[in-house]
């Protein structure tokens, strides 16, 4: 008997137990544990089968038995031990007969079956399991199957992308791409799973890898929406997958609808999205429609990114079409003539696209900014022939809205360039100029540019023609002040104020002077002054015209009027010329002095009019009034506010005093200069002053000046003074004074670590005090003076 074969003497107690209570799982478990520890696999298998015949619905025993049987087959070849694998499958079937409601049993069976990769069996088992299991176990068994699909069936499948190269190849050769493996089994399982799936994103990603386009379209149509918030990919990529699938199932209407939806969702991607419409047309063999669509979109878009994407796509499409057609013609001569015509057509299109890229880009920019004149002027440069350029100019002047211009002069320049194009055609050029002068320009400079160009154009033929043009436009209307007010308020165009154009008046007056009619020129100048169109340059020219014509008094009168009209900062340039003319004029010395006195009043307004004081001083010097000459420079040094100009005049004043006046006068000037100038500027005058005192043998005063000057700058920055002082002490000093000089330098080198300019601003800083000593004349000093100057008179203020 079989029982005698497996039951040993030590098993008898267990046998009594299981015989008495056949349905007692505990007794069976103890018995099985004993057998398991014995290591007899046949005996254990026999005992498990006996046990499960008695207790058929105990899942824990079944699970224990099945796990043990499966472990026995670990590392065994599934094909060489196929019978053993089938036995386990039968055991699972027996288990499910009794434990069909146990979810874990179905899951364990599915994991076992998946090892065989028998897709039919997996699908059938999945169906049985879902029908038998309770609802809460459905997701678990689905997870097993889905993981199998992802990790085994779709592991090598890449995300399919439409290729322009493939699309053109199949278009030329008349067939559709089949360059992908369709996994119908996986797509059907995934589609079924989508009905209960909570996380739809990974399912959409993986079902797209099955390449079952019809199923993919159905699943995407049902589950993809703008509300989806993917984490593994982007919503845009999911929509691209959807569009790609519809293209591959030839659903043109669906493609167009979804692309339109995506353009609203992803406006920054509309260029790329529209390429899928072109892919769809190419797949349908409608290459001409694809080209027309590209032409339409590129000609209408205002989006630079969309333009770039589609333009590059079109160029690549034409390149591939040309290449594939050439290759087909090489392979098949039967349609050589038709293919050659197509090659020529696409090659011409490609050439045109490459050649006209800059022009088309300019088209786009002008669609975005039609009133941008700089773009129109750039566009003109893109064409070579006069007719093409003329068309651009014509389009520009018709398109540009003068009311929206913000840059003065550009619109006028556009019209001038337009007219310049037809300079050789006098009649046409004059017609264009007439039109240009009637444009209601917003800015005066635009209309000025047109009239100036017209004048210069006429001047090439005749000066009289040029004068005639300007005399018309500069005719003063009766209500000219009212017209100017309206223009300034923006109520009238530039034509209302053109008569007051300073640029036109300048040109007109220059032409009249060249013409040589003095009376006409004077009347024109007076008219310009009357309407306040005269500039400083016009006044100067008017005065010089009078001077050159022998009307000296009138010239000076014009100068006098002009300096009264313009503010000091502007009138300085007029005074420069006025003074030169006045000096040469046949008028009295007093009149010239009056003119100079008026000129130097500009100093009170903060104008650095150094040259006026210099000219005035030279004037008095030439007359022999030496002291007055110095006084004028002295006055300028005191009155001019600009520090550099002040220093210049002090230097000239002192130099002239040394040459023309006595030493007492010069000393007073030095003292006032040093006292009034900031220390940083005063130091420039200290050394010459010290040299002067040394020359007068004023040793103590010279030493005090050097001591004062040494404290204004760091010794390293004041070497010239220290060198002089060293030589001075060598020649005039004593041993003690020389030591004191060295001590002073060492002290200053150690302590002077701050900016002396800042120190000089404080109340306790170095202060210069002028001497009150009476010096006799300019002769040599007396013995009483030698070495006995009152040194207390120079207070160092330390």
Curated annotation (Swiss-Prot):
Spans of the HAT repeats are: 5-37, 39-71, 83-115, 117-151, 392-424, 428-460, 478-514, 516-548, 550-584, 587-622, 661-695, 697-731
Q: A GO CC term?
A: U2-type catalytic step 2 spliceosome
Q: Which UniProt keywords apply?
A: mRNA processing, mRNA splicing, Nucleus, Repeat, Spliceosome
- Is this entry keyworded Nucleus? yes
Main location as per UniProt: nucleus
Record localization = Nucleus
What's a GO biological-process term for it? generation of catalytic spliceosome for first transesterification step
Alphabetical list of SMART domains matching this protein: HAT
Summary of the function given for this chain in its UniProt record: Involved in pre-mRNA splicing and cell cycle progression.
PANTHER family to which the protein is assigned, alphabetical = PRE-MRNA SPLICING FACTOR (PTHR11246), PRE-MRNA-SPLICING FACTOR SYF1 (PTHR11246:SF5)
Q: What is this protein called?
A: Pre-mRNA-splicing factor SYF1
Name of the coding gene: SYF1
């Amino acid at each position: 008997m079989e029982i005698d074969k497996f039951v040993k003497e030590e098993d008898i107690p267990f046998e009594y137990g299981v015989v008495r209570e056949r349905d007692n799982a505990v007794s069976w478990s103890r018995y099985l544990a004993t057998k398991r520890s014995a290591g007899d696999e046949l005996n254990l298998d026999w005992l498990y089968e006996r046990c499960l015949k008695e207790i058929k619905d105990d899942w824990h025993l079944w699970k224990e038995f099945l796990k043990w049987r499966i472990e026995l087959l670990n590392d065994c070849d599934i094909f060489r031990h196929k019978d053993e694998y089938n036995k386990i499958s039968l055991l699972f079937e027996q288990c499910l007969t009794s434990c069909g409601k146990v979810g874990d049993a179905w899951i364990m069976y599915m994991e076992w079956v998946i090892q065989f990769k028998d897709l039919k069996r997996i699908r059938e088992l999945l169906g049985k399991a879902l029908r038998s299991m309770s609802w809460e176990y459905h997701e678990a068994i689905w997870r097993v199957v889905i993981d199998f699909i992802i990790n085994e069936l779709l592991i090598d499948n890449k995300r399919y992308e439409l290729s322009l190269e493939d699309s053109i190849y199949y278009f030329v050769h008349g067939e559709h791409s089949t360059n992908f493996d369709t996994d119908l089994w996986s797509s059907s399982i995934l589609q079924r799973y989508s009905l209960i799936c909570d996380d739809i994103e990974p399912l959409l990603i993986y079902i797209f890898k099955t390449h079952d386009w019809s199923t993919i379209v159905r699943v995407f149509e049902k589950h993809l929406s703008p509300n989806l918030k993917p984490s593994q990919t982007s919503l845009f990529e999911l929509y691209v997958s959807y569009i790609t699938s519809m293209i591959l199932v030839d659903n043109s209407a669906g493609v167009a609808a979804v692309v339109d939806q995506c353009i609203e969702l992803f406006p920054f991607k509309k260029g790329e999205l529209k390429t899928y419409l072109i892919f769809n047309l190419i797949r349908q063999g409608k290459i001409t429609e694809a080209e027309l669509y590209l032409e339409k979109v590129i000609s209408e878009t205002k989006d630079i990114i969309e333009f770039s994407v589609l333009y590059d796509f079109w160029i690549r499409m034409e390149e591939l079409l040309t290449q594939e057609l050439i290759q087909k013609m090489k392979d098949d001569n039967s349609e050589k003539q038709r293919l050659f015509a197509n090659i020529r057509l696409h090659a011409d299109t490609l050439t045109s696209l490459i050649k006209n890229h800059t022009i088309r880009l300019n088209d786009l920019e002008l669609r975005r900014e039609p009133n941008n004149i700089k773009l129109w002027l750039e566009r003109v440069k893109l064409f070579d022939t006069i007719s093409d350029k003329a068309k651009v100019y014509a389009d520009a002047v018709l398109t540009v809205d003068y009311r929206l211009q913000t840059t003065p002069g550009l619109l006028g320049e556009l019209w001038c360039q337009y007219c310049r194009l037809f300079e050789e055609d006098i009649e046409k050029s004059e017609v264009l100029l007439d039109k240009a002068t009637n444009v209601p320009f917003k800015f005066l400079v635009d209309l000025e540019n047109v009239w100036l160009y017209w004048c210069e154009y006429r001047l090439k033929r005749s000066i009289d023609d040029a004068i005639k043009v300007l005399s018309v436009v500069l005719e003063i209307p009766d209500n000219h002040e009212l017209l100017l007010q309206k223009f300034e308020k923006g109520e009238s165009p530039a034509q209302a104020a053109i008569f007051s154009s300073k640029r036109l008046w300048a040109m007109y007056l220059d032409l009249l002077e060249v013409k040589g009619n003095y009376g006409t020129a004077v009347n024109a100048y007076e008219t310009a002054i009357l309407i306040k169109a005269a500039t400083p340059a016009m006044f100067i020219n008017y005065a010089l015209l009078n001077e050159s014509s022998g009307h000296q008094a009138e010239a000076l009168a014009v100068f006098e009027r002009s300096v009264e009209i313009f503010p000091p900062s502007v009138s300085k340039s007029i005074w420069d010329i006025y003074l030169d003319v006045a000096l040469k004029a046949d008028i009295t010395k007093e009149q010239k002095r009056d003119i100079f006195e008026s000129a130097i009043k500009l100093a009170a307004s903060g104008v650095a009019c150094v040259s006026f004081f210099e000219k005035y001083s030279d004037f008095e010097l030439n007359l022999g009034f030496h002291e007055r000459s110095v006084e004028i420079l002295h006055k300028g040094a005191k009155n001019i506010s600009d520090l550099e100009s002040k220093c210049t005049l002090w230097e000239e004043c002192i130099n002239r005093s040394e040459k023309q006046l006595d030493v007492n006068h010069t000393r007073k000037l030095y003292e006032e200069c040093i006292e009034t100038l900031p220390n940083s500027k005063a130091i420039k005058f200290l050394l010459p002053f010290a040299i002067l005192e040394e020359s007068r043998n004023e040793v103590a005063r010279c030493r005090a000046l050097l001591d004062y000057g040494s404290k204004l700058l760091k010794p390293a920055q004041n070497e010239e003074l220290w060198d002089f002082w060293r030589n001075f002490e060598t020649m005039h000093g004593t041993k003690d004074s020389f030591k004191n000089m060295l001590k002073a330098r060492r002290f200053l080198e150690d302590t002077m670590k701050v900016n002396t300019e800042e120190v000089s601003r404080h109340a306790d800083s170095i202060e210069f005090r002028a001497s009150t000593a009476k010096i006799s004349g300019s002769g040599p000093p007396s013995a009483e003076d030698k070495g006995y100057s009152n040194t207390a008179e120079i207070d160092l203020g330390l």
